[in-house]
Amino acid sequence: NSVVLGKKQRFHSWG
């Protein structure tokens, strides 16, 4: 779960 959250957070930062 932590991995998904980190990936999502990183993607959000890009946008």
Swiss-Prot record:
GO BP term, example: neuropeptide signaling pathway
Which UniProt key words apply to this protein?
Amidation, Neuropeptide, Secreted
Residue list for modification Glycine amide: G15
Domain of life, per lineage: Eukaryota
Gene Ontology terms: cellular component: extracellular region
Task: Describe, from its UniProt entry, the tissues in which this protein is expressed.
Answer: Expressed in the CNS but not in midgut, ring gland, thoracic perisympathetic organs (tPSO) or abdominal perisympathetic organs (aPSO) (at protein level).
Cell compartments where the protein resides: Secreted
What does this protein do, in the record's words? Acts through intracellular calcium in Malpighian tubule stellate cells to raise chloride conductance.
Mind telling me what this protein is named? Leucokinin-like peptide
